[in-house]
Curated annotation (Swiss-Prot):
Keywords: Oxidoreductase, tRNA processing. It comes from the Bacteria. It comes from Shewanella baltica (strain OS223). GO terms for molecular function: oxidoreductase activity, acting on paired donors, with incorporation or reduction of molecular oxygen. SMART domains: RHOD. Disulfide bonds: none annotated. Its EC number is 1.14.-.-. Belongs to the TrhO family. Catalyzes oxygen-dependent 5-hydroxyuridine (ho5U) modification at position 34 in tRNAs. It catalyses: uridine(34) in tRNA + AH2 + O2 = 5-hydroxyuridine(34) in tRNA + A + H2O. CDD domains: RHOD_YceA. This is tRNA uridine(34) hydroxylase.
Length: 334
């Protein structure tokens, strides 16, 4: 069986004409039968895609030939099945959304630490180790002694820093994320806030798992990934977790035995949070998914990435609307 190559990539680079890249990039991906999502913005490119080894190599060569997109940071892993259902290239304001204006990793960023040197750094008692990922990601795996900020989205990370970290007290801060991109912005943000020694795991967790032997590793658990594999183990192979199609939380086989778990409808994490209307919608979606499977077709309802992204976009739209209303009220007062 031909292995599917999964490629996570990103690069912060000034792309003033990023809109013009979308069409030829999408055409190249479709021709090579590459699936997944790439984001383009004026600050660079980010995303995860999958295809044959030849297709992924062709994509990297194609990107390398585009002005500014050479030498892209990328990590490869492998799967027996295609983890995506769609091919998408999206235009965004940011390639990773922190929501803080003026943060530019091209101008200032933390000190990169190679995976081989990471254990020594985080074993230093003077270093505070912070996991920049969301809480549901942290729950299934993290580094030994890492602090969990308990955030739902990356937008909440700046507030966590304001409330919990102090440049005068926390002299050395080390941070990590899945592939490294969130730390590009989080370390840049900390530097802007006056923190002096700020460190960043180069290549993220995925690069660490790739290069550090399991017997020497300080990683505990599995690493959440934003595709249908849900999580990967230390060998970068699909882990033991599944995902609830209702709330998107990772779930174990034990949790799937719970009366609260209904495939595509609910799980122990969300059984008390979903409304009757949502439940009916999820039941119908699951019915459509099963019909599509019976016809040997992919159904939009089973596309994990699309559901996650839609939920995030909805939350961001709600935040923007709330901010606009708040600004309008302030203007009326003035």
């Amino acid at each position: 069986m031909t292995k599917v190559v999964v490629c996570a990539l990103y690069k912060f680079v000034s792309l003033p004409h990023f809109e013009s890249i979308r069409a030829p990039l999408l055409a190249m991906m479709e021709q090579a039968e590459i699936k997944g999502t790439l984001l383009l913005a004026s600050e660079g490119i980010n995303g995860t895609v999958a295809g044959t080894q030849e297709a992924i190599e062709a994509l990297l060569v194609w990107l390398n030939g585009q002005n500014g997109l050479d030498n892209i940071v990328h990590k490869l892993s492998f799967d027996d099945e295609m983890p995506f259902y769609r091919t998408k290239v999206k235009l965004k304001n940011e390639i990773v959304t922190m929501g803080v204006e003026g943060i530019d990793p091209l101008k200032v960023v933390g000190t990169y630490v190679k995976p081989q040197d990471w254990n020594a750094l985080i074993s230093d008692p003077d270093v505070i180790l912070v996991d920049t990922r969301n809480d549901y990601e942290v729950q299934i795996g993290t580094f030994k002694n890492a602090v969990n900020p308990v955030t739902e989205t990356f937008r909440e990370f700046p507030e966590y820093v304001k409330q919990n970290l102090d440049p005068a007290k926390h002299k050395k801060v080390a941070m990590f994320c899945t592939g490294g991109i969130r730390c590009e912005k989080s370390t840049a943000y900390l530097k802007e806030q006056g923190f002096d020694e700020v460190y960043h795991l180069e290549g993220g967790i995925l690069k660490y798992l790739e290069e550090v032997k399991a017997e020497e590793s300080l990683w505990e658990g599995e690493c959440f990934v934003f595709d249908n594999r849900v999580a990967v183990n230390h060998d970068l192979k699909k882990g033991q977790y599944d995902q609830c199609n209702a709330c998107r939380m990772p779930i174990t086989e034990v949790e799937k035995q719970s009366p609260a778990y209904v495939q595509g409808v609910s799980c122990p994490h969300c059984i008390d949070k979903i409304s009757d209307e949502q439940r009916k919608r999820f039941v119908e979606r699951e019915r459509q998914v099963n019909l599509a499977k019976a016809r040997n077709e992919a159904h939009i309802g089973s596309d994990v990435n699309q559901v996650i992204e839609a939920r995030r976009e909805k939350k961001e739209a709600q935040r923007r609307l709330a901010a606009e209303k708040n600004n309008a009220k302030k203007s009326q007062v003035l």
